[in-house]
Amino acid sequence: MAEEAVDARGEGARFIEKVKSICGNTSRILYKYDEPTDPRYGYLPHERPLDVYLRYGMIVVDKPPGPTSHEVVAWIKRMLGVSRAGHGGTLDPKVTGVLPVALERMTRIIGTVMHSSKEYVCVMQLHRPVEEDRLREVLKLFEGEIYQKPPLRSSVKRALRTRRVFRIELLEYTGKYALLRVDCEAGTYMRKLCWDIGLVLGVGAHMRELRRIRTGPFSEDSGLMVRLDDVAYAVIRWREEGKDDLLRRVVIPGEYSVCHIPKVLVRDSAVESLTHGAQLAAPGVAAVEEGVEKGGMVALMTLKGELIGLGKALASAQEMLEAERGIVVSPTRIIMERGLYPRMWKRQQAPQGA
């Protein structure tokens, strides 16, 4: 009995909507072609065989105090037996919180998708108490574009640079201690920010404690974050009992990392050509998220919800829906392996010899 085609607006579409909901993305998916996707090719992301699932997986770790970010990644590599893993933004040893760890194929885009805003909760200790109104007044001065020079103990060159602080909220203030919530651009040094605030106040200050509560699309209240002992227990259960249910909970499909990036859904017939370096032409577009803008980054996805890679949109969402020919997306980073979908383009025959 032949396998039935999967409705393009069925399981794959539901998975994409679930991915979008992680970061509150409510943009609509606008369909150009209402066609099915062939179940013989590719996988629904949550139904991949375990070895494939791990190759395209991520773990959102609640980093404990003590180990470095690199040590956390090394432990996860050893536990899972994967060859490659990488994290989405370094946390100092004493700092806790959200640390996304990409596995295997997902390491190709982790730096790109995580290089966005980050959010922290910070305990700042003033060296002398000040009036709360004065503190709030100075905190406002540090919203917007600020100048920073990396600390002495830093892995990057100590050159003056600008960073954007989107919001600083004073949550509590008691005696010399201020609890702050800071939403800022990636690469902002919180320790230096506290020191500069103390300098402007005229009393001095330093960072006492720090926790990252969001990086890119992942936050501590998303329901995706796990502890290292959760990972260890899931691996033991898998290796000793052959049960992978817990492992599939702690490792999530890497597609969640692009929940905030506008999406272009690709027809089955165009997927394999993208993995071979081709650009995406208008006839290969099945659907477009309404937030796609010309010149912006897009996530290329199959109708099953698999991430093919990232690209630069050469047309707006409406233009992609209306176009019948021409290149509409130029891929910048492909993560999907070759051979999951059929070759649908014609091979160019070599000219006959004279």
Curated annotation (Swiss-Prot):
<feature type="active site" description="Nucleophile">
    <location>
        <position position="92"/>
    </location>
</feature>
<dbReference type="InterPro" id="IPR012960">
    <property type="entry name" value="Dyskerin-like"/>
</dbReference>
<dbReference type="InterPro" id="IPR004802">
    <property type="entry name" value="tRNA_PsdUridine_synth_B_fam"/>
</dbReference>
<protein>
    <recommendedName>
        <fullName>Probable tRNA pseudouridine synthase B</fullName>
        <ecNumber>5.4.99.25</ecNumber>
    </recommendedName>
</protein>
<keyword id="KW-0819">tRNA processing</keyword>
<dbReference type="InterPro" id="IPR036974">
    <property type="entry name" value="PUA_sf"/>
</dbReference>
<dbReference type="InterPro" id="IPR032819">
    <property type="entry name" value="TruB_C"/>
</dbReference>
<feature type="domain" description="PUA">
    <location>
        <begin position="261"/>
        <end position="336"/>
    </location>
</feature>
<dbReference type="Pfam" id="PF08068">
    <property type="entry name" value="DKCLD"/>
</dbReference>
<dbReference type="GO" id="GO:0003723">
    <property type="term" value="F:RNA binding"/>
</dbReference>
<comment type="similarity">
    <text>Belongs to the pseudouridine synthase TruB family. Type 2 subfamily.</text>
</comment>
<dbReference type="InterPro" id="IPR002501">
    <property type="entry name" value="PsdUridine_synth_N"/>
</dbReference>
<dbReference type="GO" id="GO:0000495">
    <property type="term" value="P:box H/ACA sno(s)RNA 3'-end processing"/>
</dbReference>
<dbReference type="InterPro" id="IPR015947">
    <property type="entry name" value="PUA-like_sf"/>
</dbReference>
<dbReference type="GO" id="GO:0031120">
    <property type="term" value="P:snRNA pseudouridine synthesis"/>
</dbReference>
<dbReference type="GO" id="GO:0031119">
    <property type="term" value="P:tRNA pseudouridine synthesis"/>
</dbReference>
<dbReference type="Pfam" id="PF16198">
    <property type="entry name" value="TruB_C_2"/>
</dbReference>
<keyword id="KW-0413">Isomerase</keyword>
<dbReference type="GO" id="GO:1990481">
    <property type="term" value="P:mRNA pseudouridine synthesis"/>
</dbReference>
<dbReference type="InterPro" id="IPR026326">
    <property type="entry name" value="TruB_arch"/>
</dbReference>
<comment type="function">
    <text>Could be responsible for synthesis of pseudouridine from uracil-55 in the psi GC loop of transfer RNAs.</text>
</comment>
<dbReference type="InterPro" id="IPR002478">
    <property type="entry name" value="PUA"/>
</dbReference>
<dbReference type="GO" id="GO:0160148">
    <property type="term" value="F:tRNA pseudouridine(55) synthase activity"/>
</dbReference>
<dbReference type="Pfam" id="PF01509">
    <property type="entry name" value="TruB_N"/>
</dbReference>
<dbReference type="GO" id="GO:0031118">
    <property type="term" value="P:rRNA pseudouridine synthesis"/>
</dbReference>
<dbReference type="Pfam" id="PF01472">
    <property type="entry name" value="PUA"/>
</dbReference>
<dbReference type="InterPro" id="IPR020103">
    <property type="entry name" value="PsdUridine_synth_cat_dom_sf"/>
</dbReference>
